[in-house]
Swiss-Prot record:
It comes from the Bacteria. It is an enzyme of class 2 (transferase). The lineage of its organism: Bacteria, Pseudomonadati, Pseudomonadota, Gammaproteobacteria, Pasteurellales. GO terms for molecular function: 3-deoxy-8-phosphooctulonate synthase activity. Belongs to the KdsA family. This is 2-dehydro-3-deoxyphosphooctonate aldolase.
Length: 284
């Protein structure tokens, strides 16, 4: 199976290319924090030679509680994204939840993301595809890796073949997620070689019974990320925060920003090693 390359400016995203770090914060909390977080990622990735795309949401439309912080909204969020691009020269990925958001968001950012909970909503998928933007499809927690091929087909039928697939964990009973490491190769096969990336942060989520917000397993972020990159994938999705315990969304799963360089250094070493190996055919 030939690995497809999705280009984001001068960045090649492919399962056999050096991994791309899609990193940032869960949701835009303020303009100043976005600048701080983006600058930290840029410094680390430039130092280590890791391709980088900034990530954040302008609206977390699927929060469990109506009282939870959602973000600054599309208009203000796009202004912040544009300033990040102008200041740091970064590529940006963000998610959309409504059809009317697709084109305005695609006009500013470089990748638009199809949220896991909405990945089978055909009208939204079609609207995203018709923008011509690169699309990152989050695998729903309730969907098997092999079913991702159907979502890819919807996008391709609209004339867009710039597709990245992302695993963010699978439901394991109630209120818990696990990651099936065999699922990455299944998604590669289902999409006929599209890039597959791993959202390690959201895969660490778990819930307290009757709670209004997700808990998380931040202490295990390194071992889970190592495992994912050891499979041989196109990229890693990561959220970091200056003070995870004070984050407005998913702080229990976020990497402390102070640990970013050490973390990325380890991930690069693993990715370099794994992709230095010749591919073995064990299917005989």
């Amino acid at each position: 199976m030939q690995n497809k390359i999705v280009k984001i400016g001068n960045i090649d995203v492919a399962n056999d290319k050096p991994f791309v770090l899609f990193g940032g914060m869960n949701v835009l909390e303020s303009r100043d924090m976005a600048m701080q977080v983006c600058e930290a990622y840029v410094k680390v990735t430039e130092k280590l030679g890791v391709p980088y795309v900034f990530k954040a949401s302008f609206d977390k439309a699927n929060r469990s509680s109506i009282h939870s912080y959602r973000g600054p909204g599309m208009e203000e969020g796009l202004k912040i994204f544009q300033e990040l691009k102008d200041t740091f020269g970064v590529k940006i990925i963000t998610d959309v939840h409504e059809i009317y958001q697709c084109q305005p968001v695609a006009d500013v950012v470089d990748i638009i993301q199809l949220p896991a909970f909405l990945a089978r909503q055909t009208d939204l998928v079609e609207a995203m595809a018709k923008t011509g933007a690169v699309i990152n499809v989050k695998k729903p927690q309730f969907l098997s890796p092999s079913q991702m091929g159907n979502i890819v087909e919807k996008i391709e039928e609209c004339g867009n073949d710039k597709i990245i697939l992302c695993d963010r964990g699978t439901n394991f009973g109630y209120d818990n997620l696990i990651v099936d490491m065999l699922g990455f190769s299944v998604m590669k096969k289902a999409s006929k070689g599209n890039p597959v990336i791993f959202d390690v942060t959201h895969s660490l989520q778990c819930r307290d019974p009757f709670g209004a917000a997700s808990s998380g397993r931040r202490a295990q972020v390194t071992e889970l990320a190592r495992s994912g990159l050891a499979v041989g994938i196109a990229g890693l999705f990561l959220e970091a925060h200056p003070n995870p315990n004070q984050a407005k969304c998913d702080g229990p799963s976020a990497l402390p920003l102070s640990a970013l360089e050490g973390f990325v250094s380890q991930m690069k070493a693993i990715d370099d090693l794994v992709k230095s190996f010749p591919e073995l055919d064990t299917s005989i």
